[in-house]
Structure formats: C-alpha cells, structure tokens
C-alpha cells in the first residue's frame, strides 16, 4: 500500500488540442513536413502521421508508397479537399449549407469517417427542418385558397373547381372536378385531411427544394377520403391501373405535399389515354395530362431494385437504404457493398493507389493488382472445378466456365457430371 501511495498520476486534459495547435503552427512554417498533397493544382504540405490518423485513404497511400508527393483529383473543388485536410490539424470544419453534399462526397472518398457522420447528420437535420417549415406554409396557403374559392363561388358559378394531385415521388397528374354548389363540402374535406396529415405524416416524405418560390403551386395529394363525404361532391373515381398502383402503393391514407412549377398547369390535356375516369357528365377538365407531365418531369432517379422512380436525389438516397444499396453521386450507379463504391469513386477521381513494384503500373483495386502480380510470378491460383485448367485471372476463369461449361463461378457440377468430365 505504501508503494502505491508513492505513485503520482497526472492527466493532461488539453494535451491533444495543444499538440494539434503546435503541429499546425509547424505546418504553416513548413517545418518537419514530410509529405506534399496535391489536390488538382492546390498544394497542401503536412505531416504523414497526422493525415494518416484522420484519413484511412491517406494512411493506405503512405503504406503503399514512400513518396513524399501524393496527387489527388477531386472533381468537385480543390478548396473542399484542402479544408478537409486542414481540419485534421484544427479539429473544426466550416461547411456552407449548399456545399454539404460536396463535403460529404469528398470526405467519403478520403474515408474520413468522423466528417462523413457529421455531414450525414446535418443533411438529415436540415431536410427535416425544411420539410416542417414547408408543411406549415402549405397549411396556411391551403386555408387561404379554400377561403378564396368560397368567396368566388357566385362569380364562377358555371365553372368547376380543379385540384391537381401529384405524388412526391412521381410526376403523375390527377384532376378532380367539383361542382360549385358543393364547394363547402370540398373545404371541410380539405381541412379534415389537413389535420389528418399532421397525425399520420410519413418520415420518408421530403423535398429537395429549401424554400417555396412565388411562381410555384402548393399542391395536395388526396389518396383516400371517406366515401360518405365524397359521393355528394361528385369526385372522380380512379380506374384500375397498374401505373396508379405503382405510384400510390406507399402513400395510401396520407397527404403528400409537393411543389410543381407553374408551367405544369399549362400543359395541354389532349392525350388519348388517362389514368382516372370521370363520373360527372359534361365536365371537360384536363384529365389526360399524365404523358405530358412525364415528358416535363422525367424520373431522373430510377430504383434498380423496384419500379419506383424519384425526382429528387434526397428521396432516392432514403429509398436506397431500404434495399441496402450504395449510390455514386457522380454517375448514379449503385453498389451492394461499400468497398465497391469506394473503388468506383476512385475511378471517377482518377486515383490509382495500388502500384505494381515490378513494372510500376497502377490500379484502382487491390484485387486487380493481385491478378496483375500473377503475371510476373507465373502463379495460376484460379482453378476450374469442372476440369483441370487453371488461370492467372479470375475474369478468365469466369469466361471459361460460361463459354465451355455453361456455368457461373459460384455453380458446381453435380457429382455424376463431374465424373463424366473426368472420364473425358
């Protein structure tokens, strides 16, 4: 006990911050810097130990080569890359809201996990805040719009009220026609559904636009309404359509808020086939505008696993999480494994971090480098389980199995077929 009491323990809580500040000061004075990072045409001098501790990508670069110069091509902005590397010394990063995706992409490429997590949290936070603000603004606009409809009832007695419905994730246009004498029913229905939307709002609903513009239309999507209140209002009933079920399968019993540019309302409705049938005779509203809207707002993001399509990348990214897919923000290609996405991004950036020590040829993936080394060593590690042939490259084995045996690399021959192959 006496020996333990003689031991004094000191804890320096600010040691990490102080060391980083001094290291950054030495970097600014270009003292003890052992590596130069070139991001496009921008040079950043630093210390390998600091950069390797903050970036897995930089650590792998330093392990693969002993060169004092590392070149990185970041397509978005060299300034973004420089600030990311500088944050390794300062422990802080200032990101403009409109450049959040740029920083997220660059940090993912540099494998700076702590920055990726912060950017992802910030992106989700701002999307939720913007969605809440938009919903509040839309509720006010809906009330004002309903009041104007009631006031103008006498002036427009020969006209029908039109409600354009557009789902958040698809450019489908639906027109409902309500006679002027039933406008009170419409107003009460909209108000009740607005309250219901607050209680049943789905967390998946969002919009990429940060704020409404003056020339945009505030639009409601009415998916299901009680039949008692609708029959008197002469609402149009939907026809059976596979296309309708595709777009509305996940939005039943909910109100979906969205925005559409004012020019959408001007699209002529002269298509030959519509999605909804009219129960009210004599109405001549634009009910066949679906094809025109699809031409104006084509689905820019099509899910590779299901028929759903999306206009906004934020909605598309959220949907891909359901399928456990990883999206390349540069070209839109999806991957089932994150390591394949990282390798794909290196191809966009022009980075080939794996180099052959024999011929100095560079590659984007370690597996490709290993196949290349088999050429120098003469090894043939890939063996066909159907015959005695072996190959240097895995791609050559796959081609052999497909062309000669009609099988993929993961399939094995039945035992009797294998014995027959050996006899031949």
UniProtKB/Swiss-Prot annotation:
Statement: the UniProt record of this protein carries the keyword ATP-binding: no
Sequence ranges assigned to domain BTB in this UniProt record: 33-97
Record keyword Transcription present: yes
Biased composition (Basic and acidic residues): 408-424
Residues modified to Phosphoserine: 202
One Pfam match: zf-C2H2
Primary location: nucleus
UniProt function note: May be involved in transcriptional regulation.
Protein name per the record: Zinc finger and BTB domain-containing protein 6
High-level lineage: Eukaryota, Metazoa, Chordata, Craniata, Vertebrata
Gene assigned in the entry: ZBTB6
